[in-house]
Amino acid sequence: MNHKQVAERILNAVGRDNIQGARHCATRLRLVLKDTGVID
């Protein structure tokens, strides 16, 4: 799986409009979500 495929899966799981912010380090991606109740 390439980076674009991983990004698409994440966006589909949490909802594109549900992401308020994002941060990353070498091993983790941290997302700030508007509503955690709608996560698939």
Swiss-Prot record:
Residues 3-40 form the PTS EIIB type-1 domain. SUPFAM superfamilies: Glucose permease domain IIB. Keywords: Kinase, Phosphotransferase system, Sugar transport, Transferase, Transport. It catalyses: N(pros)-phospho-L-histidyl-[protein](out) + sucrose = sucrose 6(G)-phosphate(in) + L-histidyl-[protein]. One of its GO terms (biological process) is phosphoenolpyruvate-dependent sugar phosphotransferase system. One of its GO terms (molecular function) is protein-N(PI)-phosphohistidine-sucrose phosphotransferase system transporter activity. It is an enzyme of class 2 (transferase). The keyword Hydrolase does not apply. Its EC number is 2.7.1.211. The active site is at 25 (phosphocysteine intermediate). It comes from the Bacteria. InterPro entries: Glu_permease_IIB, PTrfase_EIIB_Cys, PTS_IIB_1. It holds the Pfam family PTS_EIIB. The phosphoenolpyruvate-dependent sugar phosphotransferase system (sugar PTS), a major carbohydrate active transport system, catalyzes the phosphorylation of incoming sugar substrates concomitantly with their translocation across the cell membrane. This system is involved in sucrose transport. The PTS EIIB type-1 domain is phosphorylated by phospho-EIIA on a cysteinyl residue. Then, it transfers the phosphoryl group to the sugar substrate concomitantly with the sugar uptake processed by the PTS EIIC type-1 domain. This is Sucrose-specific phosphotransferase enzyme IIB component. The lineage of its organism: Bacteria, Bacillati, Bacillota, Bacilli, Lactobacillales.
